Amino acid sequence: MSDLTIIFLTVNKVPDAWAEYHKSVLLAAIGDTPIITISREPMDWGLNLIQSEEPSVNNIYRQILRGAKLATTPYIAIAEDDTLYHADHFKFRPPLDTYGYDMHRWGLFTWGKPTFYYKDRISNAAMIAPRELVIKSLEERFAKYPDTQIGELGKEKGTTLDRHNTVGYWPDTGMIFFSHVNSLDPTEQHKSKKMGTVQAYEIPYWGRAENLVQNWK
């Protein structure tokens, strides 16, 4: 995909075996698409940038800005180290004034009875967006709110920044995000997070939750 660059974010806190499994799944999904890896420890794949800042929501978006400025393609896609992707996820392209978010996302806890669940919300880990729009939005955000923890691009919740169009898209296959104790989310750190009401033990493409979660080790 010559019009897209993947920006892969990790602070290298996921289990080693998982990191290797995740890498194999991601590379199979993106093929020859260029990738920028942003990590706390050196990595030998993609164009690797090192970050030294403490993990935070604010820092996630600062690293995205670094990657977006380094990329040269019209679009960027975010990939996170606790989310499994498939090839169809990366085929969507929103208009140049719009943020795209994959809405077909299933969650899976790394504790308790392995169960897939669905929640209807956007996520940074599911974003595909025009590169220039990302740069413009984040430069405006950090100029006005340099230290504020602000969430997904396009929504700019709790700010007076200009909102931008967002659009959801639904590939036939769902992506999988894992909840774990090294997350920035306190409910995941304390294992108190609640599942969505739509739940399943098995879903197409990924198979049974009890088997998939075994890769988190």
Q: In which residue ranges do the predicted regions lie?
A:
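N-proximal low-complexity "stem/linker" segments adjacent to membrane-targeting elements
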Residues: M1-Y21
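Residues at the starts of beta-strands that form the adenosine-phosphate
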Residues: D3-T5, D32-P34, Y75
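Short acidic, S/G/P-rich loop/turn micro-motifs used as interaction or catalytic elements
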Residues: V11-D16, T83-Y85, V134-K136
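Short, acidic, metal-binding catalytic loop of nucleotide-sugar glycosyltransferases
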Residues: E20-T33
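Short, polar loop motifs at secondary-structure junctions
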Residues: I35-D44, D81-T83, R105
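Active-site-proximal specificity loops/subdomain of glycosyltransferases
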Residues: T37-P74, D88-K91
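GT-A fold catalytic core of metal-dependent nucleotide-sugar glycosyltransferases
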Residues: A68-M103
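Conserved catalytic core of nucleotide-sugar-dependent glycosyltransferases
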Residues: F90-W216
